[in-house]
């Protein structure tokens, strides 16, 4: 249970018991609980969207996006902004990329990408609400993206010292695999949730080929990218299945 509390405390801003005696190694082992934390995020987003949709789909979409940002504390959005700034200013220089990535200030690239990301989630979530996306799929998409993020830390080397480095060398691969199997079993009730794996794999391949590893900021950016892309793929899949888009 300590692992679940640590995972929720790290990935969400929910009011939880404070574990004052925890060691950093415990947080690393808590990576197996990242999918469970994702389920909590997804459930909160789905609930907010469902309540808002009672009045209007746009209000439901806005409520969902606000909840998404609030419950995660903007953690992954911060990583997305930092990664965008680094990519925009690095000019293919790996050393400069890491230098800009470590800068706590948000630049123009980061601001632009943040606005686009929030707008994309708002529009895509509204589209999915009008398509009657199965609620379990919305719950499962954040779980899959966080499971994927845990996998990136286990499979890719860290680009710099930090928490990402500890995850990489001390992570629990067996627990991560078991978490994936459990998520797959749950996702069988709404297979459209599996679309989240497509952008997650693509982001992992991109990190491997273009960057050669991962950092916490890049992992956060990957979660945001994977969530938005998964919403888009889910919408296209539903529209195709219902004949709204010609196949």
UniProtKB/Swiss-Prot annotation:
<protein>
    <recommendedName>
        <fullName>Adenosylcobinamide-GDP ribazoletransferase</fullName>
        <ecNumber>2.7.8.26</ecNumber>
    </recommendedName>
</protein>
<keyword id="KW-1003">Cell membrane</keyword>
<dbReference type="GO" id="GO:0051073">
    <property type="term" value="F:adenosylcobinamide-GDP ribazoletransferase activity"/>
</dbReference>
<comment type="similarity">
    <text>Belongs to the CobS family.</text>
</comment>
<keyword id="KW-1133">Transmembrane helix</keyword>
<keyword id="KW-0460">Magnesium</keyword>
<keyword id="KW-0812">Transmembrane</keyword>
<feature type="transmembrane region" description="Helical">
    <location>
        <begin position="31"/>
        <end position="51"/>
    </location>
</feature>
<feature type="transmembrane region" description="Helical">
    <location>
        <begin position="109"/>
        <end position="129"/>
    </location>
</feature>
<dbReference type="GO" id="GO:0008818">
    <property type="term" value="F:cobalamin 5'-phosphate synthase activity"/>
</dbReference>
<dbReference type="GO" id="GO:0009236">
    <property type="term" value="P:cobalamin biosynthetic process"/>
</dbReference>
<keyword id="KW-0472">Membrane</keyword>
<keyword id="KW-0997">Cell inner membrane</keyword>
<feature type="transmembrane region" description="Helical">
    <location>
        <begin position="57"/>
        <end position="77"/>
    </location>
</feature>
<keyword id="KW-0169">Cobalamin biosynthesis</keyword>
<keyword id="KW-0808">Transferase</keyword>
<feature type="transmembrane region" description="Helical">
    <location>
        <begin position="218"/>
        <end position="238"/>
    </location>
</feature>
<dbReference type="InterPro" id="IPR003805">
    <property type="entry name" value="CobS"/>
</dbReference>
<comment type="function">
    <text>Joins adenosylcobinamide-GDP and alpha-ribazole to generate adenosylcobalamin (Ado-cobalamin). Also synthesizes adenosylcobalamin 5'-phosphate from adenosylcobinamide-GDP and alpha-ribazole 5'-phosphate.</text>
</comment>
<feature type="transmembrane region" description="Helical">
    <location>
        <begin position="136"/>
        <end position="156"/>
    </location>
</feature>
<comment type="pathway">
    <text>Cofactor biosynthesis; adenosylcobalamin biosynthesis; adenosylcobalamin from cob(II)yrinate a,c-diamide: step 7/7.</text>
</comment>
<dbReference type="GO" id="GO:0005886">
    <property type="term" value="C:plasma membrane"/>
</dbReference>
<feature type="transmembrane region" description="Helical">
    <location>
        <begin position="189"/>
        <end position="209"/>
    </location>
</feature>
<dbReference type="Pfam" id="PF02654">
    <property type="entry name" value="CobS"/>
</dbReference>
């Amino acid at each position: 249970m300590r692992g679940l509390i640590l995972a929720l405390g790290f990935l969400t801003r929910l009011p939880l018991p404070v574990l004052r005696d925890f060691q950093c190694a415990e947080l690393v082992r808590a990576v197996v609980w990242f999918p469970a934390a994702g389920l909590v995020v997804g459930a909160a987003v789905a609930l907010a969207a469902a309540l808002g949709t009672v009045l209007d789909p746009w209000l439901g979409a806005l409520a969902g996006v606000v909840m998404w940002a609030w419950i995660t504390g903007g953690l992954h959005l911060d990583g997305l902004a930092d990664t965008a700034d680094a990519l925009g200013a690095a000019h293919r220089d790996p050393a400069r990329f890491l230098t800009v990535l470590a800068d706590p200030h948000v630049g123009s690239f980061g601001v632009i990408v943040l606005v686009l990301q929030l707008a994309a989630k708002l529009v895509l979530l509204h589209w999915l609400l009008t398509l009657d996306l199965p609620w379990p799929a919305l719950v499962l998409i954040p779980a899959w993206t966080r499971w994927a993020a845990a996998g990136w830390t286990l499979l890719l080397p860290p680009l710099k010292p930090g928490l990402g480095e500890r995850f990489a060398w001390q992570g629990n691969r067996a627990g991560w695999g078991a978490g994936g199997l459990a998520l797959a079993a749950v996702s069988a009730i709404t297979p459209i949730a599996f679309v989240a794996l497509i952008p997650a794999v693509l982001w992992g391949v991109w990190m491997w080929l273009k960057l050669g590893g991962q950092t916490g900021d890049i992992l956060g950016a990957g979660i945001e990218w994977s969530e938005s892309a998964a919403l888009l793929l889910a919408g296209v899949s539903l529209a195709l299945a219902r004949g709204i888009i010609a196949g």
